[in-house]
Amino acid sequence: MRLCVQGMRCLRASTPRIVQLPRSSVLLRTACATRAYSSVPPTGSSDSVTIRGQTIKTDPEWFNVPNNVLEATSRKLHLLKDHPVSITRQIMQSNFPEPTFKYYNEFSPVVSTKQNFDSLGFPVNHPGRALSDTYYINSETLLRTHTSAHQADRFRGNESAGYLVSADVYRRDAIDRSHYPVFHQMEGAMSWDRTKVPNGDVAAAVWKDFEKLPVHGVKVDDPNPRNPLQDAHHTAAEAEAIGAHLKRSLENMVVDIFSRAKATALKEDPNFVDEPLQMRWVEAYFPFTSPSWELEVYYAGDWLEVLGCGVVNQDIYINAGVPNQLGWAFGIGIDRIAMLLFKIPDIRLFWSKDKRFLSQFEGVTDNLDKIKRFVPFSKYPPCPKDVSFWLSSTTAAGGNTKGTFHENDVMEIVRNVAGDVVEDVRLIDEFTHPKTGRKSMAYRIVYRSLERTLTNDEAVAFHEDVRQALVKELGVELR
């Protein structure tokens, strides 16, 4: 389910500033191998593309996957030995042990629109379906936008009481230090079957399982939320028991992660302030769970929004062919947790093949107690450049239909031209001419290489290519 913490936050003026950490899966929007995996680059022709051995027919009216994103489909960072994303996945996964939970880490990123949207109840006009937000191969096939694309299949397969799906996911998005068109999520769920628990008493069975969970000892604020129950499907006792099991399970994972981060910080940073960890549950409303919550953690002086979760909407079980089951699900963004755990300042670093980056984490996969903070090689100077243009029509940024302007189109063009040399792209001005009604937009593009100093001449060359690509692909008029 797509409990997307990002974009669905509830801001409260009376509480301290909250730093938004994860890109959760739809739920949350959100056997483990440790060897290195070979990377077979995707191949394509004018009418097809091959990704991880699967050849798919493309449709020119829909196909919008750039080469840099296609190339990323072969990387599998979440399975790469001694890579921070993979290490973080291992730590998360270790808190949901086999055989209760089965791990799925190898699913192809190519899914159907039915898997990614229909099975989760996305309306046909939902903005997440738009070409401006999602990478399509053809009208019925796309690169998954969340690990929840596999949720209905996992419930239908019914192979274990619980499961974890960890995977690379793809979204057309902004350009800055915490956003990248490819990132990684973990989604988990646990279910109970009315026909298999003693006397059909799900609440009693869940509480029995709850008593087996470890007790962490960290202060948690949980102010009895007023979330709506699914009265047609669940009793209040069932919802209470499932919610308690869900919260304790996730609290244990989060305490493990942040305790490791804190221990590393205390060891390596003499200025780190040692404050007790705190957690709080915040009432939330997501379309695919009810009741629903977000978990926030107080760490290093900030409240961090970590994940989204809830009691699974019963219709998802019913549509998956397992109507007697009920349970919980959660989603969490792996990359941003890894950025915090290893103090990595820029998400682009995860995709670097520079040994100065990768060598810093050697041996950690085999000993998770050896986690250490990233040490920057150098701070290379930025080269900011501005570009402004008139739109070819009066369509405002944010349009969602093919042929209209969308800011993500600008981001995609900049990435296609300059790749990971681009650190940040921001809208700095927009103006509508009072007489003609034409709209002008201005963006600041920051060019900065992570691996060497970028000369001004190189930045100028990249920027001119970006300007010309904007004209060619969007039909804008440069100012």
What are these regions (language model features)?
Residues 1-27:
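Fungal secretory targeting signals
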Residues 2-10, 38-185, 189-191, 196, ...:
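Class II aminoacyl-tRNA synthetase-like tRNA-binding/catalytic domains
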Residues 65-77, 220-237, 383-385:
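A short, surface-exposed helix-loop junction/capping segment
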Residues 96-102, 256-264, 270-277, 414-425, ...:
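Short secondary-structure junctions
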Residues 103-129, 261-299, 427-436:
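Beta-rich nucleic-acid/ligand-interaction surfaces
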Residues 129-130, 134-137, 147-170, 176-181, ...:
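Prokaryote-biased recognition of long, low-complexity C-terminal linker/tail segments
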Residues 191-221, 261-266:
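Internal, charge-rich low-complexity segments
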Residues 282-479:
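A carboxyl-terminal module marker
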